[in-house]
């Protein structure tokens, strides 16, 4: 049975599964769909053309599905889609997309989004990510599966963060982070720079020694050699041709990510 607190305002046109709960003083708009078992905390707003899947837990004072902070926005019916089993903590803001992009902001499954996080318009967030408190991503950012963003980190618009990458706390990121790479600020300032392969994270997620060794070799070619970016890509592609099929999959993801960069990679 749906549990709606007497002080909550749920529009009659909203579609809520039978066991959704909505806390005190929360607002759910007319174009919202919420799946089974999702819990909306107190003083939370869910608005816009927003679809939320099953088993999510959205904390108090969150703002989900608000209009984009984009001066080009003209009240177009753009969307926000959130998958299943996500935790979205207090004071988080997540905005719908814009027609200048896909018209969609999307968040996958099993993500852990801590307090005061901002996910802007047209962002694409994968599965199993962690956004530490106060992490802020600008419009059109892509965050791959299992990526981790440290607290108070900031990400420039259109930047991509690859799968299994890690961004250190209080870091400013203005270019792409390849998959499996750690980027963090150093003593010279808060601009994120590369700091090696996320070895510990990969071990925890079941990557074997051969896969990790191949990624380390690719990292050295990209960051620790005198090769240009294009030369490094060529050498990494040659390395890919030499490894067995089991080792090749993460290395292929690394190569594909480099080939698709538009803003360049973190240096």
UniProtKB/Swiss-Prot annotation:
Class in the EC hierarchy, top level: transferase
GO cellular component: cytoplasm; membrane
PROSITE patterns: HEXAPEP_TRANSFERASES
GO biological process terms, semicolon-separated: lipid A biosynthetic process
E.C. designation(s): 2.3.1.129
SUPFAM superfamilies in alphabetical order: Trimeric LpxA-like enzymes
Gene3D superfamilies: Hexapeptide repeat proteins, Udp N-acetylglucosamine O-acyltransferase, C-terminal domain
Pathway: Glycolipid biosynthesis; lipid IV(A) biosynthesis; lipid IV(A) from (3R)-3-hydroxytetradecanoyl-[acyl-carrier-protein] and UDP-N-acetyl-alpha-D-glucosamine: step 1/6
Residue runs in coiled coils: none
Keywords: Acyltransferase, Cytoplasm, Lipid A biosynthesis, Lipid biosynthesis, Lipid metabolism, Repeat, Transferase
GO molecular function, one term: acyl-[acyl-carrier-protein]-UDP-N-acetylglucosamine O-acyltransferase activity
Cellular compartment(s): Cytoplasm
Reactions it catalyzes: a (3R)-hydroxyacyl-[ACP] + UDP-N-acetyl-alpha-D-glucosamine = a UDP-3-O-[(3R)-3-hydroxyacyl]-N-acetyl-alpha-D-glucosamine + holo-[ACP]
Function in brief: Involved in the biosynthesis of lipid A, a phosphorylated glycolipid that anchors the lipopolysaccharide to the outer membrane of the cell.
Family to which the UniProt record says this protein belongs: Belongs to the transferase hexapeptide repeat family. LpxA subfamily.
SUBUNIT field: Homotrimer.
Official protein name in the record: Acyl-[acyl-carrier-protein]--UDP-N-acetylglucosamine O-acyltransferase
Lineage: Bacteria, Pseudomonadati, Pseudomonadota, Betaproteobacteria, Burkholderiales
């Amino acid at each position: 049975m749906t549990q709606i607190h007497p002080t909550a305002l749920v529009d009659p046109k909203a579609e809520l599964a039978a066991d959704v709960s909505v806390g005190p003083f929360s607002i759910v708009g007319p174009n919202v769909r919420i799946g089974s078992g999702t819990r909306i905390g107190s003083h939370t707003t869910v608005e816009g053309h927003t679809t939320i899947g099953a088993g999510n837990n959205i904390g108090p004072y969150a703002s989900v599905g608000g209009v984009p902070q984009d001066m080009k926005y003209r009240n177009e019916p753009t969307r926000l889609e959130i998958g299943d089993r996500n935790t979205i903590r207090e004071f988080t803001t997540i905005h719908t997309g814009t027609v200048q992009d896909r018209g969609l902001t999307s968040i996958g499954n099993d993500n852990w989004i801590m307090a005061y996080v901002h996910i802007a318009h047209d962002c694409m967030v994968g599965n199993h990510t962690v956004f530490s408190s106060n992490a802020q991503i600008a419009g059109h950012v892509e965050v791959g599966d299992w990526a981790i963003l440290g607290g108070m980190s900031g990400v420039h618009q259109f930047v991509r963060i690859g799968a299994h990458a890690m961004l250190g706390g209080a870091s400013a990121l203005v270019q792409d982070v390849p998959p499996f790479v750690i980027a963090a600020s150093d003593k010279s300032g808060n601009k994120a720079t590369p700091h090696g392969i996320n070895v510990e994270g990969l071990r925890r997620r079941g990557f074997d020694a051969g896969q990790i060794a191949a990624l380390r070799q690719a990292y050295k070619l990209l960051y620790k050699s005198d090769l240009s970016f294009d030369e490094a890509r060529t050498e990494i592609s040659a390395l890919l041709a030499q490894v067995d099929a089991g080792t090749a999959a993460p290395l292929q993801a690394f190569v594909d990510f480099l080939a698709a960069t538009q803003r360049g990679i973190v240096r």
